[in-house]
């Protein structure tokens, strides 16, 4: 049967692969080639206050958190992802086994005995796992869009099957759920008008409400996450630590670094202390490596964050931040509204001996070039 809507599947998958699986490209050998194109799109979003927030992250990516709930999410992302992959593969094998050995028959056994679209449910679960690991607002919006398109794709497939198999498929519809077993939720009527302008308006309204609700939830999670990451802020300087360091230690490290004459001169040359300039500093254990931050040059390797670090030996990365919006940002709003970080100085301090061990000018960009990476 010819299907004029057959382009939906590759189109939906393209959105999913390019946007939602950014993290998988980032850690692969093709990362530089991928970002040679994708980074331009992310930077384009950052040029307008209307879209710059899409580059932001709404959950911690490399920072430890004092919230047990957030910490748990960081531990289960891989389990969710691989659970979804396993479910997808079971459905895949079942479909193609039926195509090979039971030609012309619909798939109604095993997973399909309770759910009509287990593979779409699997993709939903995979997306949750990826989003927990790489929680960019753009990923969130793309994920909701993908779910919305898959719902209508599933409805379209059901109409085709109903036309092809008739009463037997109608009976199957009556005893199964679309994405979850029917017994979980009971019978639910269609929530959209059948056809015409009313249906089109309802679809647009439903999509807007879903994306709006997801984004609002994302901003709430971002605010909650920042409250549970080690931080303190002044009017023009926000300070974060990926480690769970107390506020007094953060302040001590930053003030000691700023008291060094050479560092103070470097900061002043970039406008520190002048009005309407925003700065963000990271206080990081000396031995930690975080490729998401423009610190030391790191040609290879991922995150290295040993728990048994010396809390007195720290490095402080000072950056000047470009924020989106038409007014100046202060406090933690510098983090929430940050678009670009310009590295200024990387200062190594020993709090125990009250020494500045040295400072250097950090790399201009992260390993992947001028691409928006997580702020916390």
Task: Give the location of each predicted region.
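Membrane-anchoring alpha-helices and their flanking helix-loop junctions
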Residues: 1-108, 126-375
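Conserved SAM-binding loop
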Residues: 114-121
């Amino acid at each position: 049967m010819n299907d004029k809507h057959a382009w939906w599947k590759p189109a939906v998958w393209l959105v999913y692969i390019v946007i939602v699986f950014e993290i998988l490209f980032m850690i692969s050998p093709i990362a530089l080639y991928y970002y040679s194109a994708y980074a331009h799109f992310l930077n384009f979003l950052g040029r307008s206050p209307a879209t710059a927030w899409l580059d932001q992250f709404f959950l911690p990516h490399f920072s430890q958190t004092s919230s047990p709930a957030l910490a748990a999410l960081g531990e289960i992302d891989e389990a969710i992802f691989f659970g979804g992959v396993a479910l997808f593969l079971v459905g895949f094998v079942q479909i193609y086994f039926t195509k090979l050995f039971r030609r012309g028959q619909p798939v109604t056994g095993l997973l399909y005995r309770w759910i009509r679209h287990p593979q779409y449910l699997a993709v939903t679960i995979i997306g949750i796992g990826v989003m927990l690991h790489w929680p960019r607002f753009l990923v969130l919006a793309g994920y909701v869009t993908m779910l919305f398109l898959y719902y209508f794709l599933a409805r379209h497939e059901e109409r085709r099957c109903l036309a092809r198999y008739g009463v037997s498929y109608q009976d199957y519809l009556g005893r199964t759920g679309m994405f979850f077993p029917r017994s979980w939720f009971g019978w639910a009527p269609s929530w959209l008008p059948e056809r015409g302008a009313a249906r089109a308006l309802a679809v647009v309204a439903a999509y807007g409400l879903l994306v709006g609700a997801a984004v609002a939830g994302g901003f709430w999670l971002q605010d909650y996450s920042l409250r549970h990451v080690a931080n303190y802020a002044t009017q023009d300087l926000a300070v974060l630590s990926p480690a769970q360091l107390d506020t007094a230690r953060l302040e001590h490290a930053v003030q000691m670094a700023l008291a060094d004459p050479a560092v103070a001169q470097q900061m002043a040359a970039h406008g520190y202390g002048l009005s309407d300039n925003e700065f963000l500093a990271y206080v990081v254990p000396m031995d930690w490596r975080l490729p998401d931050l423009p610190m030391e040059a790191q040609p290879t390797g991922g995150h290295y964050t040993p728990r048994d670090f010396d809390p007195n030996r720290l490095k402080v990365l000072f950056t000047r931040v470009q924020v989106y919006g038409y007014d100046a940002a202060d406090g933690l709003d510098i983090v929430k509204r940050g678009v670009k970080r310009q590295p200024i100085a990387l200062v190594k301090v020993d709090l125990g001996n009250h020494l500045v061990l040295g400072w250097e000018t950090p790399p201009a960009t992260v390993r992947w070039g001028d691409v928006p990476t997580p702020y916390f």
